[in-house]
Amino acid sequence: MLGTYLPIMLLILVALAFGLGSVVFSSLIGQKKFSKVKMAPYECGCEPIGTARERFPIKFYLIAMLFILFDIEAVFLYPWAVLYKKLGLFGLVEMGLFVVILFVGYIYVWKKGALEWE
């Protein structure tokens, strides 16, 4: 059984070795001189305008977290959709309960005003 996973493990080892080898090799042979130009933030070849340390409104982080939450919901729903015929009524009830719990969470977030941009 271990033999079936051998190509995947070999691929992971080669990828890790290549990545780590590239980082170590570039740090060994790369130049170590830092100048003001090299330490400036890169903005698409244009001159930097203002500071790179801007504060973002907390709403952006909240929307990103909600996006990740509902994206994970889709990840959990995909295997259920693939195995729907094998799971039968039990799988339908289980996923229905899962979706209802997430919908209640969505309503809670909506009622708290997290989705409003004022």
Swiss-Prot record:
Subcellular location: Cell membrane
Catalytic activity, as annotated: a quinone + NADH + 5 H(+)(in) = a quinol + NAD(+) + 4 H(+)(out)
Pfam families, A to Z: Oxidored_q4 (PF00507)
Residues that span the membrane, as ranges: 5-25, 62-82, 87-107
GO annotations of cellular component type: NADH dehydrogenase complex; plasma membrane
Entry keyword Cell membrane: yes
Alphabetized HAMAP family for the sequence: NDH1_NuoA
Name of the featured protein: NADH-quinone oxidoreductase subunit A
Species assigned in the record: Trichlorobacter lovleyi (strain ATCC BAA-1151 / DSM 17278 / SZ)
